[in-house]
Curated annotation (Swiss-Prot):
Keyword match Phosphoprotein: yes
Classification lineage: Eukaryota, Metazoa, Chordata, Craniata, Vertebrata
Gene3D superfamilies: Dbl homology (DH) domain, Pleckstrin-homology domain (PH domain)/Phosphotyrosine-binding domain (PTB), SH3 Domains
Region (Disordered) residue spans: 1-26, 85-115, 215-242
Identification of the protein by name: Spermatogenesis-associated protein 13
Domain of life where this protein originates: Eukaryota
Start and end residues of each stretch annotated as ABR (APC-binding region) domain: 102-154
Role noted for this protein: Acts as a guanine nucleotide exchange factor (GEF) for RHOA, RAC1 and CDC42 GTPases. Regulates cell migration and adhesion assembly and disassembly through a RAC1, PI3K, RHOA and AKT1-dependent mechanism. Increases both RAC1 and CDC42 activity, but decreases the amount of active RHOA. Required for MMP9 up-regulation via the JNK signaling pathway in colorectal tumor cells. Involved in tumor angiogenesis and may play a role in intestinal adenoma formation and tumor progression.
Length: 656
């Protein structure tokens, strides 16, 4: 999550905070972001500004990248082979202001020349002067909590899906607008999405540049509100429109400059030092950890130079930067390689961080380069975040660009182009990261039979409890998990309701869903409510299911449509998970479950499926178009003992 400085324009007097939102006019408010500079020096200020909420659950205990505690603080120690060269020269960089006149006669610009002779197009001091607030420790938290305590609505847009089976965490999909209600913790914020309030990872969202007065329910899908918001924005007062467009342009320019500094620090602060220590790192290890980030750095430098040429410093709202994105849209494809490599980089880095020698080395690199207090894995996440931010920034810029503006058509085309790039990369990343959780889920199921779930599936679409009706009219309560290509049936343990037993599966490629109207079914001679059928294409065998509520049935019907659509999209895009990654995921899951206590018949006891350990980034692949059903929270329906014991010994109709 990139922090933000906050600037406000003139405002009218209003009633005390919280008394009359309609009477106060305090717009536009700009939240212009850069990079996280969290610290502990202003924690008390943050707490004082925070509006005390109602009783809330504790902040989730697990860490959320990029703020994982993998870097140990350096204590004085003797220099060794794991100490980066030049650590004894740590101090303020020697600054030289040089005048560079561009070939087209542009204005002078400052360059930063460090002790190694490398040159950058802007200096750290210039960044501080341009954005004094967000470069200060705790600047973003102070800015957000000031707005919240003043009664303002603060909204953020989701960069990625956040799917969770934890009631205390907020689930959302990429592009959703989330109202931020508390930002006292640097990793987890409290927010509202639709009608639910819970914790969510701060690094998963981007604050809106222009915080406008929104309806009480600020959360909505980005795609659904885009046209409506754009239409409203274009009817605003011209001066307000220009100011808001200026805010977005400045955010794009400022975040791009800070991003370049991050890339430079990674390449010069980490990679350069690692290559000098051949005894610690192999070429293959460095390729795994850093991927093609040096190529990204070269590309982004050229992209920023072109942006600077199109940037109008005197009147930023007149800047025409859309053409820059269109000219470089093919170059952004290099991010796909980096994002696909990123999960492997996290694994390799995590293995190295188990050794104190590497922890000290990477921390020394950070100190030598005078980088902000974020661990290396946090810096390596920034390219993944950046490529997902471009569509959100361009969407907001388009919102405040009139159709008469010279850059309107280019911005619109650039938004569509970058959205497609980000969607493809995000989808590939979600697929890779989902397989670990699916593997752990399978290991937790008692009595699993047949092929591994990953042999055919890579995505959990939906899950929930259904009643399966047999031809004899008997009911069987089962929990179903719908993956791409297959539907898995499980049964709860009679005594331990958190334990699941494998009962069978169905091939979704070989069945069709048929909706059943409420009333008496002639084929089954039963009165049915909230029912649907799965009919085999080959044998015409029919499986009848009933949901508890009409809403549950609607979710299953939508989930079936989503499953078919996702399978087709994967085939069109050639989306396949490498076999070696599937095998590695299963191997890691089996190792994690090895040695646990045994249950009935020496079967491993399954942990509660609702509390499976979270994945890196926690944006696994439950479908984004439907809410996840909390199946573990459902009450067990009452059944007559005689029916239960009569059917206890019978096999499920599902084919194993």
């Amino acid at each position: 999550m990139h922090p933000a400085s906050v600037t406000t324009t003139s405002q009218d007097p209003c009633a005390p905070s919280g008394s009359c939102r309609g009477g106060r006019r305090r717009r536009p408010i700009s939240v212009i972001g850069g990079v996280s500079f969290y610290g502990n020096t202003q924690v008390e200020d943050v707490e004082n500004l925070l509006v005390q909420p109602a009783a809330r659950p504790p902040v989730p205990a697990h860490q959320v990248p990029p703020y994982k505690a993998v870097s140990a603080r350096l204590r004085p120690f003797t220099f060794s082979q794991s100490t980066p060269i030049g650590l004894d020269r740590v101090g303020r960089r020697r600054q030289m202001k040089t005048s560079n006149v561009s070939s087209d006669g542009g204005a002078e610009s400052s360059a930063l020349v460090d002790d190694n002779g490398s040159e950058e197009d802007f200096s750290y001091e210039e960044l501080c002067q341009a954005n004094p607030r967000y470069l200060q420790p705790g600047g973003e938290q102070l800015a957000i909590n000031e707005l919240i305590s003043d009664g303002s609505v603060v909204c953020a847009e989701a960069l990625w899906d956040h799917v969770t089976m934890d009631d205390q965490e907020l689930g959302f999909k990429a592009g959703d607008v989330i109202q931020v209600l508390e930002a006292s913790n640097k990793d987890w914020w409290w927010g509202r999405n639709e009608d639910k309030e819970a914790w969510f990872p701060a690094s998963f969202v981007r604050l809106r540049v222009n915080q406008e007065e929104l309806p009480e329910n600020c959360s909505s899908s980005h795609g659904e509100e885009q046209d409506e918001d754009t239409s409203k924005a274009r009817h605003k007062h011209p001066e307000s429109q220009q100011q808001m467009r200026t805010n977005v342009i400045q955010e794009i320019m400022n975040t791009e400059r800070v991003y370049i500094k991050h890339l430079k620090d990674i390449c010069e602060g980490y990679i350069r030092q690692c290559r000098k220590h051949t005894g610690m790192f192999t070429v293959a290890q460095l390729a795994t950890i850093f991927g093609n980030i040096e190529d990204i750095y070269k590309f982004q430098r050229k992209f920023l130079k072109d942006l600077e040429k199109q940037y109008n410093k005197e009147e930023p709202h007149l800047s025409e930067i859309g053409s820059c994105f269109l000219e470089h849209q093919e170059g952004f494809a290099i991010y796909s390689e980096y994002c696909n490599n990123h999960p492997g980089a996290c694994v390799e880095l995590s293995n190295l961080m188990k050794h104190s020698k590497y922890r000290h080395f990477f921390e020394a690199c950070r100190l030598l380069q005078q980088m902000i207090d974020i661990a290396l894995d946090g810096f390596l996440l920034t390219p993944v975040q950046k490529i997902c931010k471009y569509p959100l920034q361009l969407a907001e810029l388009l919102k405040y660009t009139t159709q008469e503006h010279g850059d309107y058509n280019n911005i619109k085309a650039a938004y569509e182009a970058m959205k497609n790039v980000a969607c493809l990369i995000n989808e590939r990343k979600r697929k890779l990261e989902s397989i670990d959780k699916i593997a752990r889920w399978q290991v937790s199921i008692v009595g699993w039979e047949g092929l591994d779930i990953l042999d055919r599936s890579s995505e959990l679409i939906h899950s929930g409890e259904l009643t399966k009706i047999t031809r004899q009219g008997k009911s069987q309560q089962r929990i179903f998990f719908l993956f791409d290509h297959q539907l898995v049936s499980c049964k709860k343990d009679l005594l331990r309701r958190d334990m699941l037993y494998y009962k069978g599966r169905m091939d979704m490629d070989e069945v069709e869903l048929v909706d059943v109207e409420d009333g008496r079914d002639k084929d089954w001679s039963l009165s049915l409510r909230n029912a649907f059928k799965l009919v085999s294409k080959a044998t015409d065998e029919v499986h009848l299911f009933c949901a508890r509520k009409q809403e549950d049935k609607a979710r299953w019907l939508q989930a079936y449509a989503d499953e078919r659509r996702r399978v087709q999209e994967d085939q069109q895009m050639g989306m396949e998970i490498p076999e070696n990654q599937k095998k590695l995921a299963m191997l890691n899951a089996q190792k994690a479950g090895h040695g646990k206590s045994k249950g009935y018949n020496s079967c491993p006891v399954a942990p509660p499926h609702q509390s499976l350990p979270p994945l890196h980034q926690r944006h696994i692949t439950v479908p984004t178009s439907i809410p996840q059903q909390q199946v573990f929270a459902l009450a067990e329906p009452k059944r007559k003992p005689s029916i239960f014991w009569h059917t206890f010994h019978k096999l499920t109709p599902f084919r194993k």
